[in-house]
């Protein structure tokens, strides 16, 4: 990536039509990326992916995807475990056919296991995922996401560690989830800087040139995330966050997950350009 691009989680709300029309509308809005939302189902066929690929290339839109919500790589139920792996693999297959760049997902829950045992289970599952993905795409990034609840696997350190130990894996950094997961921490300039410093320390400067970021407003409590909000209604200091991203010359994509996806995406893009 040569710069930091802004876009929407899914096709813009104001889109009239399908994913292809969503890509065209993202370009009309002056945004540069879009996340394919497979959160409830992988809803793009192989045939449709060819059309999505063509539209994204023509409009110069970078595509990412969010794999289904039903993933729990730490499930003791073997059927759910293997289904979770397949959700990620199949999301990557379709995203690859769409000429997508990155696949993010929530890896699972600690349940009754220790954090270390959960880590090892998730790591073993992800090894299987990467082995499969390499058969059809050796460049697409597989990205476990920082999660928003303390019951979920996915702290910053866990995600960095997976990225250190597995090929083709990098973090998806959700700053709203960091805020919610820590019940209000990581919301000042020094704290935002500490996140980027931790990533660079663990994964090198290249990691800051290759970031898949989620930003939204968020409501949270003691156990973490409750729901997403528009930025202006949230405690997240998104202005300071964008300032830090600009100062550090971070490159990659910022996907807006606020309820008003295109409005907040354009708000962030315009603010970022002013710094």
Describe the function of each predicted region.
Residues 58, 74-173:
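Active-site acidic/histidine proton-transfer and metal-coordination neighborhood
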Residues 26, 34, 66, 84, ...:
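Conserved, mostly hydrophobic/aromatic
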Residues 15-27, 45-46, 53, 114-134, ...:
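Distinct, well-ordered alpha-helical segments
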Residues 262-275:
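C-terminal helical cap(s) of enzyme catalytic domains, especially alpha/beta-barrels
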Residues 23-30, 44-64, 90-99, 130-137, ...:
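Acidic (Asp/Glu)-rich catalytic clusters
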Residues 9-13, 37-41, 68-72, 108-110, ...:
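Active-site beta-loop-alpha junctions enriched in small/polar residues
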Residues 129-224:
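Acidic/histidine-rich catalytic cores of soluble enzymes
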Residues 1-90:
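N-terminal pre-domain/capping segments
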């Amino acid at each position: 990536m040569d710069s930091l691009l802004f876009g929407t989680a899914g096709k813009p709300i104001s889109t009239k039509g399908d994913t292809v029309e969503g890509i065209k509308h993202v370009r009309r809005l002056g945004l540069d990326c879009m996340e394919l939302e497979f959160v409830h189902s992988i809803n793009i066929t192989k045939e449709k992916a060819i059309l999505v690929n063509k539209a994204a290339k023509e409009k110069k839109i970078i595509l990412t995807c969010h794999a289904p919500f039903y993933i729990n790589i730490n499930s003791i139920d073997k059927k759910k475990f293997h289904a979770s792996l397949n959700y990620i693999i199949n999301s990557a297959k379709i995203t690859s056919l769409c000429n997508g760049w990155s696949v993010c997902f929530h890896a699972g829950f600690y349940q009754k296991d220790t954090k270390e045992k959960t880590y090892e289970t998730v790591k073993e599952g992800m090894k299987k995922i990467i082995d499969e993905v390499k058969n059809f795409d050796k460049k697409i990034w597989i990205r476990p996401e920082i999660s928003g609840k303390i019951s979920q696997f996915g702290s910053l350190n866990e995600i960095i560690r997976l990225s250190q130990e597995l090929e083709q894996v990098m973090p998806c950094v959700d700053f709203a989830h960091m805020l919610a997961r820590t019940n209000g921490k990581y919301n000042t300039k020094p704290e935002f800087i500490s996140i980027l410093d931790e990533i660079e320390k663990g994964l090198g400067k290249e990691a800051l040139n290759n970031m898949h970021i989620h930003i939204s407003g968020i409501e949270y409590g003691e156990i973490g995330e409750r729901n997403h909000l528009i930025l202006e209604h949230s405690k997240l200091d998104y202005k300071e966050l964008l300032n830090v991203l600009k100062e550090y010359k971070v490159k990659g994509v910022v996907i807006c997950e606020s309820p008003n996806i295109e409005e907040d995406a354009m708000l962030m893009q315009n603010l970022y350009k002013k710094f």
